[in-house]
UniProtKB/Swiss-Prot annotation:
Disulfide bonds: none annotated. Its main location: cytoplasm. GO terms for biological process: regulation of DNA-templated transcription. HAMAP family: Transcrip_reg_TACO1 (MF_00693). It is found in: Cytoplasm. Belongs to the TACO1 family. This is Probable transcriptional regulatory protein Tcr_1104. Keywords: Cytoplasm, DNA-binding, Transcription, Transcription regulation. Signal peptide: none annotated. One of its GO terms (cellular component) is cytosol. It comes from Hydrogenovibrio crunogenus (strain DSM 25203 / XCL-2). GO terms for molecular function: DNA binding.
């Protein structure tokens, strides 16, 4: 069994409200990524991967273009990355990534999700030491030796490579993301990445055996998902 990462294939939202939420989260992340790293996907690999993910989630082109245009224009909202962590229901370990223009509001909203589920938000580092901050690149392939060689030739610090069900999964420290992706594309040409993300990966995962705690954990995730500022939630729970 491979490393536990979240393969967030954004499913088609069933309602207009759900679609609007998905579009808004992608729009905000595209804007911030383009503003910080440049609006050209060819030179901003994080933006390139994000746009591909947005397209797979069926985000309309006009939503993507509007976010890029806003980043080109300068000014606009001043979003900052905010990260919170703590112990959720069932003694789960949770990391919450946000993009916010009002950190005080966002902290209050996230803390409320903990409070309403009778859990407590933690201090920075309280659970993140039990996660790896890693880049994950997954694509169709069989020859993991060739992939490893290409990465090592480019002096990429490789954490792990898996070959399972006709797919190769590459794990590298998040700081090696651009170098690893460039090395793979240089070696093998255009690649359709099934997963192209930076995530927090738990060192170990566990089930929540108590049904009441499991239901409360799922409610906790739903509450976080309803917050506009929350972009990603990482946890050590097997659902």
């Amino acid at each position: 069994m491979g490393r536990a990462y979240q393969n967030r294939k954004e499913s088609m939202a069933k309602t207009s409200d759900a679609k609007a939420k998905v579009y808004s989260k992608f729009s905000r992340e595209i804007y911030v990524t383009a503003k910080s790293g440049g609006v050209e996907p060819e030179s901003n690999l994080a933006l390139q991967g994000l746009i591909e993910r947005a397209k797979k989630a069926q985000v309309p082109a006009h939503v993507i273009d509007k976010a890029l245009d806003k980043a080109k224009g300068g000014g606009g909202e001043d979003f900052a990355i905010a990260r919170y962590e703590g112990y959720g229901p069932g003694n789960s370990m949770v990391i919450i990534e946000c993009l916010t223009d009002n950190p005080n509001r966002t902290f209050g909203d996230v803390r409320s999700c903990f409070t309403k589920t009778k859990t407590k938000i933690g201090t920075q580092g309280s659970v993140s030491h039990m996660f790896d901050h890693a880049a994950i690149l997954v694509f169709a392939g069989e020859d993991e030796e060739a992939v490893l060689e290409a990465l090592l030739m480019a002096d990429v610090d490789v954490s792990d490579i898996e070959n399972e069900d006709g797919k190769i999964s590459v794990f590298v420290p998040h700081t090696e993301y651009a170098k690893a992706k460039t090395a793979l594309v240089d070696a093998f040409g255009a690649i359709d990445f099934e997963v192209d993300e930076i995530q927090f990966l738990p060192h170990m995962t566990k089930p929540i055996d108590n049904e009441e705690d499991r239901e409360l954990f799922e409610k906790f995730l739903e509450m976080l998902d309803d917050l506009d500022d929350v972009q990603n939630v990482y946890y050590d729970v097997e659902l």
